[in-house]
Amino acid sequence: MKLQHAKFHFVGVGGIGMCGLAELLHNIGAKVSGSDQAENANTERLKELGVKVFKGHASSNVGDADVVVYSSAIQYGNPEISEARARQIPLIPRAEALAEIMRLKRGIAVAGTHGKTTTTSMTSAIFLEANLSPTIVIGGRFELIKSTAMLGSGEWLVAEADESDGSFHKLSPEIAIITNIDSDHLEHFKTFENVQKSFHDFALKVPFYGKVIVCGDDPLVRQIFENFPKRILFYGFDEKNDLVVTGEHGHYAVHRNDRLLGTKHLVGEFDLKVPGRHNALNAVAAICAGVAAGIPFATCAKGLQRYEGVDRRFHFKGEKKGIKVYDDYGHHPTEVRAVLQAFREKYPKQRLVVFFQPHRYSRTQHCWHDFTTAFMEADQVLLTDIYPAGEAPIPGVTSEKLASEMKHEHAQYFVRDDKATQKILGMLKEGDVFVTLGAGDGWKLGLEVLNQL
């Protein structure tokens, strides 16, 4: 059965990764339906495109589907999952559906604990600049295409590869990018060693004629891939890398190391509108993918110059009364440090007020020590209750306790009640930069603050 003739039903279609895939299959010509507990902007967009979306989960929603696609957020006892099992309808994770689309194209898969969405969107910007009409699947709304997905007529597919449940092993890309490997999603992997092995095994899926692109700044990551049996390219700020990036404040240069001759030469220069060393690294990874696909460096640089960002990544929401409001998805200590350093780079003299909502009890517990020192670039930190993401509370793991152990002099526990917006408005003054951080629903508070300024 060809994809365009199949009937797909998505369980959890409102999720940021699921909605893009549903849109892509709909545009290919497949019959697509979906369901979610709550309606949101993603489900509304799908409805506008003509996709049938059910609010809530019920066995009848499955209908005459040929295959049921589920997200990692869906619980085992979901009635639609049970219905598919009872009727022996194939059940596949999101990554397997993406893998089926990737089989029709030349795939570029962007993996890594941090920076996947940004790197995927930067890579997409480069391929768009080169007029290659790529198919795109991103875990965030990409400003250049005003969506999370786009069906292109070209031969390349640029996709974000989510490692959180290990299902990215379903993908077989021609080019794989690994931005970094950090200790996260231990609710699935159990140990950091399992996380490392998962990325190693993902990279093994690349064919002999493909390329694995890895940030080599982390010695542990270099160790994992040092004698890797595929064509590999290390990039980063460290002089040991094959491609070395230098520069700061939005202007960067890339040099190529010739290990055999012991020489180094300039490959090219590029400019970025988005601040931060982490974004410079993301950009170099995207350049590597572009050049590997035959795109000239100059075209890659032009694509990056056009890059305006992606939703929920250093996202400027607006300014009123001299107060700027931003939102960022960062929810791991490594991400928090990187994004706050980027804010400090962009606003060296302004007061930075950060509202942070931890995401998952398990992550908060595992990263507890790192969280206590992750906010040093902020001037004031407001720590609200943990967003559970379906997890049960863990005794002793609370935001109130974490706030009391923070090394930051001006960190405090903040109750998000019906007076929260007014309390924050009372703290802010002209010239401040207010940032909502986290993978939960804290961004809504930022909009409320902006609307009431």
UniProtKB/Swiss-Prot annotation:
Pfam families: Mur_ligase, Mur_ligase_C, Mur_ligase_M. It is found in: Cytoplasm. Its EC number is 6.3.2.8. Keywords: ATP-binding, Cell cycle, Cell division, Cell shape, Cell wall biogenesis/degradation, Cytoplasm, Ligase, Nucleotide-binding, Peptidoglycan synthesis. GO terms for molecular function: ATP binding; UDP-N-acetylmuramate-L-alanine ligase activity. Disulfide bonds: none annotated. It is an enzyme of class 6 (ligase). Belongs to the MurCDEF family. This is UDP-N-acetylmuramate--L-alanine ligase. It comes from Bdellovibrio bacteriovorus (strain ATCC 15356 / DSM 50701 / NCIMB 9529 / HD100).
